[in-house]
Each structure stands twice: as C-alpha cells, then as structure tokens.
Amino acid sequence: MTTEKRQILVTAALPYANGPIHLGHMVEHIQADIWVRFQRLKGNDCLFICGEDAHGTAIMITAQKQGLPPEALVAKMHKEHARDLGGFLIEYDNFYTTHSPENRELAELIYTRLKDKGDIFAKTISQAYDPVKEIFLPDRFIRGTCPRCGAKDQYGDVCEVCGATYSPTELIDPVSALSGAKPIEKNSEHFFFSLNRYTQLLKKWIDAGHLQPQVANKLKEWFSEDLKPWDISRDAPYFGFEIPHAANKYFYVWLDAPIGYMASLKNLSKQRPSVNFDAYWKEGSQTELYHFVGKDIVYFHALFWPAMLSGAGFRLPTAIYVHGYLTVNGQKMSKSRGTFITAHHYLDHLSPEYLRYYYAAKLSAQVEDIDLNLDDFIQRVNADLIGKYVNLASRCAGFITKNFGGKLANELPEPDLYESFLQTEQTITDYYESLNYSKAVRVIMSLADRANQYIDAKKPWALAKEINQEAQVQAVCTQGLNLFKILTTYLKPILPVTAKKVEQFLNCDELNFANLKTPLLDHSVNPFEPLMQRLLPETAAQLTHE
C-alpha cells in the first residue's frame, strides 16, 4: 500500500536582527527542525523556511549606535544568525530576510488588496513622542504599566504577562527607553486595518482546531470585546518599506514580518524551479502550512495574520504550534546571573546534539515553559545518550570487529525481540507528529533499557571466553546492533549527526522509516568510532561563566 506524500511548508518565527540568538530562541528552532526531519524521514515533502526580521526603529537605533547603516547591521546579523542556527543543525531550505524585494512586493500587494476591499482606513492619532530625541517612539521603546493587568515595566504594544495588546498611549506611567523622558503626545495620521471585519472568520478558524486548546481558549478571551482596528503604519524616521502613495509613512514591522514567510518561499522558488509558490499560498491550497511560534507572538500570528491572508486572497495556516519560554536553573535568563546563554557561546563549549536531545526530552504539545537545569542536563545526557544509547553499540561492536572481521550473523537469535521494537514505531511516530517529543524520547529510552538488559542477560564478554560459543557471541552482538539501528532511526530527527556516524559505522543506506523493518544480516560493518563524549560537569559549568 502506498501512501501519498504530504506536501508541507514549515516556518519558524524570524529572529530579530537586533541581537544574538540565545538558547531561548533555540527551543523553537530545534522543535521545528525535529518535526521537519521527522516528516522527511517518513518520506513526506517538507520545506522549511525562515529568515531575518529586519525592520523597525529598534534596528535603526541599534545601527546608529554601532555607526552602521541599517542594511549593514541586518547583513551582519543575518550572517551571525545563519551561523548559529546551522551550528545547532537547523537545516532551513531558505534563511532569507524581510528586507528584500520579494517582501516589499508582497507587502505592497497585500496592503493594496486590503485597501481595495475597504479594509484600510486613515485616522489621525495621538502618538508618543520623545521630546529629547525628537522621534516618534516605537512601541518597544516605551515602558510602563499594562492597562489590562497592571504588570509593571511592560512594552508599549504588548504585555508579556497577560498577552494583551494595546496602543502606547494606553500604557500607564510611560517613559521613553531612549532618553528616560516622559513622552509627550503628538498628532499624526496613521493607517489602520479593520480587524473587526474578520471577527466571524477568525472565530470560525479558531474553533476549527488549527490551534492548541490552550491557545484557542486564550484567543477567545480577546473576543469578549470588539477586536480593535490595527495600526499598520509608522512615521519617518523608520527603517522599513514605505507605504505606497503615502509620504513619510512606513509599514509597521509586524505587518511585513509574517509576510517574510511568503517572501522566503518566493525567493526559494527562484533558486529551485521545482518549488511552486502558488501551490503553498494560493487560496484553497491542498498543501499543509505550519507556523512554529512562541507564546509572546500568538496575537500577531493567530489574529492579524489569518485576517490579512484571508482579506488578500491567500490561504490560511493549517496549524500554528505555540511553545512556552525557556528558563535556566528555574529562573528567567539573566545576564547578571550568567544564565543569558547565547547560541554561539554554547557551541563554543558543547555539542549541539546534547541540547537538541535535552529539549526534545522536555518538549510536549502543551504551551509550557521548559527549564534548562544544568545538573539535570548533565545527568540526562550521560545517563540516556551515553549510558543507554551509545553504550549499546560500544558493547557489541568490538566483538564483531575483533572476532568476526566486522561481519554480522546471518540471522537474529531473538526475532521476536526485534519485532517488539518495530511494533513501537506507530506510537513513536504519533508522538513526533503531535509534538509530544518527551513521550517519544521516553519510549525510545525504555527500548534502550530493554536492549541493554538483553546484552546483560546474554553476557557476550563471558561467552567469548567459552569454547565453541563464537557463533552465539556473533548472534547476540548482531541482535544488539540491529536493535541499536532501530533506536538510531527513532532518534534520527533529534540526533542527525550521530545518525550519520551510525550509518557510516553500520555501512548501510540512510536510515528511515521505509527501511526500518529490514535487519542487517550477513553484512559487514566498519570499525566502531566513539559517537559521543561523556558530558563533564566542569564543561557544562562554562555555559554560565564567560
């Protein structure tokens, strides 16, 4: 029976070109990358795109501080971000940028279509203005108390505590983050998107199961009041795209940022003629579209974005997968505590696969924060990856190489044990598919325990010393290495580099779910090389000490 290949497009939220990628960002990129690798392992066509979120006053101001044009800052950060993501084995088909001709063209197209439908209107508003710096203050450069929940020291556009969005003028006791001055109010004409026109569409879309239940319930709270029109413009000076036929007015960064997903695919379609842009984005598309995002940007992705897409005649996402924040040793990441760990700093000291595994062992389909506890991290890596998984291969490989010239036996002594490992495939793939990686890891490690128990019971090291037990030693170790092959296939989305090393050692084709069932028998393997090093506490300690 052949199953038709799924055509899937996956995006991760665009890192902002204003600073380094840290381990909090990596939760999402690793989560998405594991899912993409799993889909490919299942034989599905899965494109994976991302890019640099390149616009906004924050970029402009950071560039000024560094004495660079904004374009140069964006190019520099794009290079650094691509390096760090690549270092963590995140394999994008295209890592592009929102400061691109494709994004300008698509932003103008979507804006024009919305305007032609009557969804855009102009209104004079009172805006926060820094009298010292003589600049209209972007939302993120105003801090104050949330008008909805009363949380202090919140941004001017969104509360990180309750998730409310609001205009900066609604903030209580605001101050400029640039000068510390109390902003004054100044009038300016802005353009608004009539989000309330899409209330029924959004309610229906949210009810249709495109979001995790927790997220859907949270969004429904926002419908208790009328959805407010969304301010999509900003005044010069600003780094971004000018709004057509509107002097000194620019698209707000959050208008063109998600359009960057489309632009990245459009750019990829120019590089790869086989990639059809319309197949993924046209209205009524039968392909699948998934966005991986953090809980802090749900409002933009699950309300504004579907409304914009619908209004402009494009397809809506199949699902938006939302994850929580990362804490380190139980607390919010902090530079003063040494727990603000950049991706680059981590990669200077440790293997990316350690963190990929640790995150996978913690991630679920829930919108829960996960904690990087360094003691637990060391223990998990050493107990699971080294003590259970790698140890299984190292216990068997030496006998096969030394005593049998690298040749495996021609049959399995315990085919039922092998079959029982295969029977967990559906459970594990269901867990991967539903983002319940922690459950998948638990099942895989319980299999590793069983495989090691088998070797413990058969004691090939003792058999090797007995007369006429050579065939039994070869058979036991062949069984062990074939169980190891299954475990490696199951772990491959999480540990791609290790899986490649295992394929080389086993001298076999690329491991995937299609060839999972076929054991390696009467087959020559290569000499075994160490797959991973034990994680030393002093090495891990360097993460929190510059």
Curated annotation (Swiss-Prot):
Its main location: cytoplasm. Binds 1 zinc ion per subunit. Keywords: Aminoacyl-tRNA synthetase, ATP-binding, Cytoplasm, Ligase, Metal-binding, Nucleotide-binding, Protein biosynthesis, Zinc. ATP binds at K335. It comes from the Bacteria. One of its GO terms (cellular component) is cytosol. InterPro entries: aa-tRNA-synth_I_CS, Anticodon_Met, Met-tRNA_ligase_1, Met-tRNA_synth, Methionyl/Leucyl_tRNA_Synth, MetRS_core, MetRS_Zn, Rossmann-like_a/b/a_fold. It catalyses: tRNA(Met) + L-methionine + ATP = L-methionyl-tRNA(Met) + AMP + diphosphate. It is an enzyme of class 6 (ligase). It is found in: Cytoplasm. Gene3D superfamilies: HUPs, Isoleucyl-tRNA Synthetase, Domain 1, Methionyl-tRNA synthetase, Zn-domain. The keyword Plastid does not apply. Its cofactor is Zn(2+). One of its GO terms (molecular function) is ATP binding. Zn(2+) binds at C146, C149, C159, C162. A motif ('KMSKS' region) lies at residues 332-336. Its EC number is 6.1.1.10. A motif ('HIGH' region) lies at residues 15-25. One of its GO terms (biological process) is methionyl-tRNA aminoacylation. Monomer. Belongs to the class-I aminoacyl-tRNA synthetase family. MetG type 1 subfamily. PANTHER family: METHIONINE--TRNA LIGASE, METHIONINE--TRNA LIGASE, CYTOPLASMIC. Is required not only for elongation of protein synthesis but also for the initiation of all mRNA translation through initiator tRNA(fMet) aminoacylation. This is Methionine--tRNA ligase. It comes from Coxiella burnetii (strain Dugway 5J108-111).
